[in-house]
Amino acid sequence: MTETPEVTLYTTKGCHLCEKARELVLTVNPNTIIHEVDIAEDDSLMEEYSSWIPVLQRGPLRELVWPFGLFEVRAMLTL
């Protein structure tokens, strides 16, 4: 049985690159569960990610910071 991958997508309203990141994830695996976190709702997340979004995170140690493409997303989802 194959595990359904889960990722966290750090985003904010109006972020067109965040939409592209979401599309990349779903292109690699349409069954991926994406937990979207709006960094504008948390001061510490704003401080950490405001210059870097979109950011994809899978588990505590795997993180992709934009720019990334299908190759990087595929590698993240299959590890």
What are these language model-derived features?
Residues 50-56:
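Structural micro-motif
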Residues 43-50:
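N-terminal beta-loop-helix "entrance" segment that forms/cooperates
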Residues 60-79:
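Non-catalytic, surface beta->alpha helical segment in thiol-disulfide oxidoreductase systems
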Residues 31-43:
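Thiol-based oxidoreductase modules, predominantly thioredoxin-like and allied folds used
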Residues 1-28, 35:
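Local sequence-structure signature of Cys/Sec-based thiol-disulfide redox active-site neighborhoods
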Residues 25-30, 56, 77:
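Alpha-helix C-terminal capping segments
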Residues 19-22, 46, 70:
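Conserved strand-to-helix beginnings and helix N-cap segments that scaffold or border functional pockets
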Residues 13, 40-41, 68:
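Short beta->alpha linker loops
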